Structures are given as C-alpha cells and as structure tokens.
C-alpha cells in the first residue's frame, strides 16, 4: 500500500477544500454576516494541513485499485470533517455529530437534514449546504482529475472508486480529458438552469442554491416548504432539470460529438424516460380530484416523480396524502433511481 502517495492526494483534496470554503465568504460579505469568519478559519486550517501533506512529492508514484479505494474513502472522511467546521465554528450547528451529519448528507447528496427550521441559518451556511451538493454530485476527486494528473496513467483507479455505479469507462482516450468533459457538461447544465430560474423571477441567491441542489440531485432546500412556495414555472424548470441531471452524462457526450442517433438508441435512456412518463400519467390521473385541473395534477405528478426517481428530494406537495396507488409508485421509484 502506497500510503505516501495516498496522503499526497488527500493533501491536494484539502487544498481544494480550502478554496471551496472561501466561496461562501463572498456570500457572507454580501449579506454582512459574521459567520463568514467561520469559513475563513476553516479554509486556513484545510489549506495549512493540505500544504503540509503536499509539500514534497512522493518518489513512489505506483497507484493501483486498492490505493484508489483507500484514497477515495479517506478523502470523503477528511472532506466531511473539514466541511463541517463552518457549522461548528459559527455556532449555528454547534453539535459535532449534527454538523457532520449535515455535511455528509450534503456531500453524498442524500439530502437528509437535522434542521427543523432551515431558514434560521445564515445565508452563507445555506449556500454552503447547497454547494456541498454540487461538489459531491459529480465527485470531488473527479474534479481533481480534471485539473491535476495526480496518479499519471493510473487515475482510472480513482475514477472507478469514486463512481457509485457498477462500471465506469472513458469517454475519450485520456482520462483527464474524460473528467474535464464530465465537469464541463455538469457546469453547463447548472448554469442553464440558473439562468432559467432567474428569468422566472427567482432571486440571485435562491437561483444559485437551487441550481446547485438540483445539479447534485441532493435537494437541500433553502425554504422550510422546499419548492412549494415558488411559481409553477420555477417548479417546472426544477422538475425538468432534475430529470436531465439524472441522465447518464455519456449520452450528453454523444450529443456533443453529434451522434444523436447513437444517443437515442440507449436502452437505459428509453427505460428512464419511459418509467417517468408512465408514472407521471398514472399518478396524475390518480390524484386529479385533489387539484383544480388534470394539467395541474400532471404537473405535480411529474415534479414528484422526477424528484423521487433521481433521489433529489425536492417537494411541492405532501404526497403522503395521495391515494395508495400513487404512494406505492413513489416508493417503487425510490428503489429504481436514475440513469
């Protein structure tokens, strides 16, 4: 086991974390919040430890599957601990375990929260919660691979360990280019959603945090009512992008290189959209008596189906009040997941 090189990778991870932690400081300054100092302190701690770990390149750069899994496992642990520091230092979530829970939920895009009143948090911490979704949605080590050739030709071991699916492959011969393409698509979709939300009348802060939470399919909301208080236009934009972020990014790559026929031949994509369509129609007609029209019922059904099948977790209604058939479909969709 090449522990020296693993520590080197963890060090770079902390350096990146230090940079990420500085972003909410901008939000804090914009709103005049003292919690911004918590991010500044956390950033300095992360960067100092990161610089210590990376001050000397290890001579032994051999890196195999076992090192890849260990690096990813340790990376997520270190990232979660350092990411929880702002909650603890600011005193807004003083309990260590609660702060860790909130941070881990963010990075893993689980979306579960210990907060009963989300709106009581400062803006910079609300931003950080959503930002952890965006960072974790694609995987921070994938982001690192797109910038740094850390493990030379053995980067694939990191990518395989980082990816949650049964298999992962290269989009192009160079793995670093693959990681760059993945993040470029991810960032582009996030930006498009952000712009559409702004056009719908959302505030700049709400649009950024909602786009981050949607992209990571995590669903950390900044309102206690989740998405219920927003307009139907906003809900539709978020619903569509939840579904789009659930699509295998390899399909988007095929569209980018002008191979739409090959992309549309994907059995995975057909099954994904087919399940969403059928579930939306069945639930929509099943709940139509609870809404003003069938179109509103279908819109609400589509939003909840998209939210559940992609495991995002945003909500616009209390679907626990829906008929048994609709609730059964919702539960089944939880186990299916997206592409």
What would you call each of these model-derived segments?
Residues 1-339:
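Membrane-proximal intracellular helices of multi-pass ion channels
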């Amino acid at each position: 086991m090449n522990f020296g090189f693993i520590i080197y990778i963890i060090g770079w991870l902390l350096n990146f974390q230090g940079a990420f932690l500085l972003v909410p400081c901008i939000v804090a300054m914009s709103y005049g919040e003292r919690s911004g100092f918590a991010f500044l302190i956390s950033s300095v701690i992360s960067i100092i430890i990161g610089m210590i770990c990376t001050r000397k390149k290890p001579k032994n750069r051999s890196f195999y599957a076992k090192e890849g899994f260990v690096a990813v496992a340790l990376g997520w642990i270190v990232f979660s601990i350092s990411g929880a520091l702002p909650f603890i230092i600011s005193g807004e979530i003083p309990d260590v375990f609660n702060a860790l829970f909130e941070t881990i939920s963010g990075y893993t895009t689980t979306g579960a929260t210990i907060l009963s009143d989300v709106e009581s948090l400062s803006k910079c911490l609300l931003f950080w919660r959503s930002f952890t979704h965006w960072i974790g949605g694609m995987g921070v080590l994938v982001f690192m691979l797109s910038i740094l050739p850390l493990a030379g030709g053995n980067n694939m071991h990191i990518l395989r360990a980082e990816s949650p699916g049964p298999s992962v492959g290269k989009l192009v011969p160079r793995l670093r280019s693959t990681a760059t393409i993945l993040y470029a698509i991810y960032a582009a979709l996030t930006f498009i959603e952000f712009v559409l939300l702004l056009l719908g009348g959302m505030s700049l802060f709400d649009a950024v945090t909602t786009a981050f939470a949607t992209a990571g399919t995590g669903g950390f909301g900044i309102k206690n009512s989740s998405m219920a208080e927003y307009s139907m236009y906003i809900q539709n934009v978020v619903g569509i992008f939840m579904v789009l972020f659930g699509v295998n990014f390899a399909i988007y790559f095929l569209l980018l290189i002008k191979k739409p026929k090959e992309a549309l031949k994907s059995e995975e994509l057909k099954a994904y959209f087919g399940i969403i369509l059928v579930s939306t129609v069945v639930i929509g007609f099943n709940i139509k008596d609870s809404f003003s029209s069938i179109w509103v019922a279908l819109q609400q059904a589509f939003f909840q189906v998209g939210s559940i099948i992609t495991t995002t977790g945003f909500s616009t209604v209390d679907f626990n009040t829906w008929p048994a058939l609709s609730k059964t479909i919702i539960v089944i969709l939880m186990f299916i997941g997206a592409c």
